[in-house]
Amino acid sequence: LGADVASALNYKLGDDIVTFAEVLRRKGYATGYAGKWHLDGDGKPQWGPKRKFGWEDNRFMFNRGHWKMFADGPNGPRVGSTKNGRPDYGLKGADEKSFATDWLTDKVINFVNEKKGKSFCYMVSYPDPHGPNTVRAPYDTMYEDVKPPIPRSVNKTRAQTPKWAAKAPRITADTIRILMPKYYGMVKCLDDNIGRILDTLRKNGQIDNTIIVFTSDHGDLCGEHGRLNK
């Protein structure tokens, strides 16, 4: 997609769309969703959109944002960090219970345990790995001694850069050296948490009767053409 198109993707999914979750729900599956949805317009974070599209338990679904901390409150889930009274991407004080990747994984595990012995479909949409390149301890320093590769394209002139990347602010090799070890930490944290889900399925005797799909909406440029993210 061109940058002009990608910047306008806060669309609402049409009411007439039948998702695979709705098909499974009609067949008697227990369905649930936690994490980023990004299919209900501009709401941010907008917890538990009213239009569920088959995801019966969508309490922990939020529409937009790459939040780093979450918390459970008396009125439902909330972003765990605020600035000037508004949710922000901070992670001060984040731990294995409040950091977004861990918190969302706990919701998956709770659902899997509750539906043990039943047919279910649960989708978790982790914000990470994604900018801002920050992650909780100990992952924040786990790869600080790693020297990330510096793409040759980072030093090219704007005239040598593809049009979709040429207008955006550029990062330097020094920035890549600082931020990519954090990115590796985000990936490791995600890997460990997916391992927790698999361990739960094994413990419950569900691992051989569960289809597991691991996918992503985009990769990361990792400094190519002076860009991070997509």
What are these regions (language model features)?
Residues 1-97, 137, 228-229:
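Catalytic-site neighborhoods of secreted/periplasmic enzymes
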Residues 63-230:
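Active-site-proximal cap/lid insertion segments
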